[in-house]
Design a protein with these regions (language model features):
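N-terminal nucleotide-binding beta1-loop-alpha1 segment
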Residues: 262-280, 440
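Conserved beta-loop-beta/alpha segment of the NTase-like Rossmann-fold superfamily
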Residues: 339-422
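Conserved donor nucleotide-binding strand/loop of the catalytic core
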Residues: 329-341
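Well-ordered secondary-structure scaffolds
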Residues: 1-262
Length: 482
C-alpha cells in the first residue's frame, strides 16, 4: 500500500521501519527545521543533510513530486518539506499516519485518506482518525485503540533506567543552540552539555547522550533539546528504540487490518422507508427531520464518508436524498416500490453491489466478502462502531457481524457472502430479522452503547434525540431490519 507518514522524527522513523519492512511504499513529510532530539535514528535528518540512513532504510530529501516518485522507484523513502501534507493530493495514499507527536491534532481529518492513524494523545478514533496508537510507556504501549483516545499527556517522560524528568536536557534560554557534547558521549551530572541563547545547560544526571538537537537550531526556553540514558549503551544511540518499534508495530497491525477490508466490502444505506409511525397524519418524512441542525438522513451519509475504501450505496426513492448522496459520491439505487417493505430495499442493494463488483476491473474476485446494511434513522451511531464491525468481519469471514447492547442484536448488520443467496429471497418488512435467528450461532455482536442503537421512529423520540424534550424516555427498540 501507499502510506504517507506526517513527521519523520524518531518515533515516526520507528513506524516507517515496520511499514517499510512489511513491503509498503512510504512517503514522509517534515517541517523546514525539524527539532528532532534523537536525530541519529530519525529520517528527518534528510531535510538538512540531504539523506539519512537508519538501519535498513535510506531516506532522501525531495523537493518536488517528480523527485519523490523517483526516490520511491529506487526503493528509498522520500522526505519532503510539507507541513500541511499537501502532497497527499497527488500521492493519494491508502493510509495516512499522523506521527507529528504534537500531543494535539494539528489538522488531520478522518477523510484525508481511506484510512487514517493518529499517533498518541490528541486524536479520537472515529472522530479525526480511524484508530489511535498508544505512545505512553507501560502495559498498553503500542496498542491499537479503535474507540476513544490514547492516555493524555502527563508532562512526565517515561521511566528509562530509573530516571524520568532528570534525563531530559532542556533549553536554558531562547536562542540558538550550541551543543557542547555529541550524541554517544558519556557525561556526568552538572556538566555543561549545551548553550542556548548564550546561557549554559547542565546535565541533571550522568549517562550517555542519546539525543541532541543539531547546532544552529533556534529554540525556546525549556524546550527539550536532548536526553541522557543511564543505561549508557552506545548501540542504543544508533538504533531504533523499543518504544518506537512498539508504536510501529501497532501502526503496522492497524494498516494490515485495513488492507483486509479495503476493496473487499460494501456498505448499503437503507433510506426508502415511509416512516409512517413518525409522520402521522401530516405525512412528513421522518428522514428529513432535523437532528442536531441537519436532516436525519445526512448523519449516516456523512459518517459513511469516513469509509472511502469500501463501495457506498444508498437505496431510496427520495429525490432530495438522491441529490445529496450523489454530491458525496454515494451510488444511488432507486427504490420505486417502498411499499414492498425493507426486504425489497435489501434485495435491490445486494443486486447493485453484486453488479458493481462483477463489472469492476480492480477486484481480486467477482464478489465482496460481505455487505454492511445500515438504516438511516440511527443518528447516534458512531463511526468507530462501524469500523469495529468491519474489523471483525475481516477476521471472521463466515460470521454475521452486528452492533448490539448487552447481547441484544441491532443495526448495522454485516452479512458475509455465503448469506447473499438467502437475502435475495427475503420479502416483506422483516428484512433479515428471521435470518439472524436462523444463524444465531454464527452471529458476532460488537458491543456498543444503548444510545447508539436507538432508531427514531416517532416524534417523541425525535424530540428526545434533539434534546427538545428531555422528559420523555426513548423506547429501547433495537431493530435488526437489515
Amino acid at each position: 500500500m501507499k502510506i504517507l507518514i506526517k513527521g519523520a522524527g524518531d518515533l515516526a522513523t520507528g513506524i516507517a521501519s515496520r511499514l517499510y519492512g512489511a513491503g509498503h511504499q512510504i512517503l514522509m513529510t517534515e517541517i523546514a527545521q525539524p527539532l528532532t532530539v534523537r536525530r541519529t535514528v530519525a529520517l528527518s535528518r534528510a531535510v538538512y543533510d540531504r539523506r539519512a540512513i537508519v538501519e535498513e532504510m535510506e531516506a532522501v530529501s525531495a523537493k518536488t513530486q517528480e523527485d519523490a516518485e523517483a526516490i520511491m522507484e529506487e526503493g528509498k523513502i522520500p522526505v519532503i518539506v510539507d507541513p500541511k501534507a499537501d502532497c497527499r493530493k497527488w500521492y493519494k495514499p491508502d493510509v495516512i499516519v499522523d506521527a507529528i507527536i504534537a500531543k494535539k491534532n494539528t489538522g488531520t481529518k478522518i477523510t484525508d485518506a481511506p484510512f487514517v492513524i493518529g499517533i498518541g494523545p490528541g486524536f479520537t478514533a472515529g472522530k479525526d482518525c480511524h484508530c489511535v496508537i498508544e505512545t505512553k510507556r507501560g502495559h498498553t504501549l503500542g496498542s491499537v485503540i479503535w474507540e476513544g483516545s490514547a492516555i493524555a499527556d502527563t508532562g512526565v517522560p517515561g521511566n528509562i533506567g530509573g530516571y524520568t524528568t532528570e534525563r531530559l536536557i532542556r533549553a536554558s534560554e531562547d536562542g540558538i543552540i550550541e551543543p557542547k557534547v555529541r550524541i554517544g558521549d558519556i557525561v556526568e551530572k552538572g556538566q555543561i552539555v549545551a548553550v542556548t541563547g548564550g546561557k549554559p545547560v547542565f546535565a541533571q544526571m550522568g549517562g550517555i547522550v542519546r539525543g541532541m538537537l543539531q547546532p544552529g537550531a533556534y529554540v525556546k526556553k525549556n524546550l527539550k533539546i536532548g536526553d541522557i540514558d543511564a543505561r549508557a549503551e552506545r548501540s542504543h544511540c544508533e538504533t531504533i528504540s523499543d518504544k518506537a518499534r512498539a508504536i510501529g508495530g501497532g501502526a503496522l497491525e492497524a494498516a494490515e487490518r485495513f488492507e483486509k477490508i479495503k476493496g473487499h466490502y460494501a456498505v448499503v444505506i437503507l433510506a426508502a422507508g415511509k416512516g409512517t409511525r413518525f409522520s402521522g397524519e401530516r405525512g412528513e418524512s421522518k428522514l428529513h427531520a432535523k437532528i442536531d441542525q441537519k436532516p436525519m438522513y445526512m448523519h449516516m451519509m456523512d459518517k459513511m464518508q469516513a469509509f472511502s475504501s469500501v463501495e457506498l450505496f444508498i437505496v431510496t426513492g427520495d429525490e432530495k436524498i438522491i441529490e445529496e448522496a450523489e454530491k458525496r459520491g454515494i451510488f444511488v439505487v432507486r427504490n420505486k416500490e417502498p411499499e414492498k417493505g425493507i426486504a425489497h430495499s435489501v434485495v435491490l442493494g445486494l443486486k447493485a453491489v453484486s453488479h458493481s463488483f462483477k463489472s469492476g476491473t480492480d477486484r481480486k474476485s467477482g464478489a465482496p466478502d460481505g455487505i454492511l446494511f445500515s438504516v438511516c434513522d440511527q443518528p447516534k451511531l458512531k463511526i468507530s462502531t462501524i469500523q469495529r464491525i468491519l474489523n471483525d468481519a475481516a477476521l471472521h469471514k463466515k460470521n454475521v457481524i452486528c452492533a448490539g447492547y448487552r447481547g441484544q442484536k441491532g443495526n448495522p448488520v454485516l452479512w458475509p457472502a455465503h448469506c447473499f443467496a438467502e437475502l435475495l429471497e427475503l420479502t416483506g418488512d422483516e428484512g433479515g430479522r428471521q435470518m439472524l435467528t436462523k444463524y444465531e450461532e454464527k452471529v458476532r455482536i460488537i458491543e456498543t452503547s444503548r444510545e447508539e442503537l436507538k432508531d427514531i421512529d416517532s416524534k417523541r423520540e425525535d424530540r428526545k434525540s434533539t434534546r427538545l424534550n428531555s422528559s420523555h424516555e426513548i423506547p429501547s427498540r433495537m431493530p435488526s431490519s437489515a
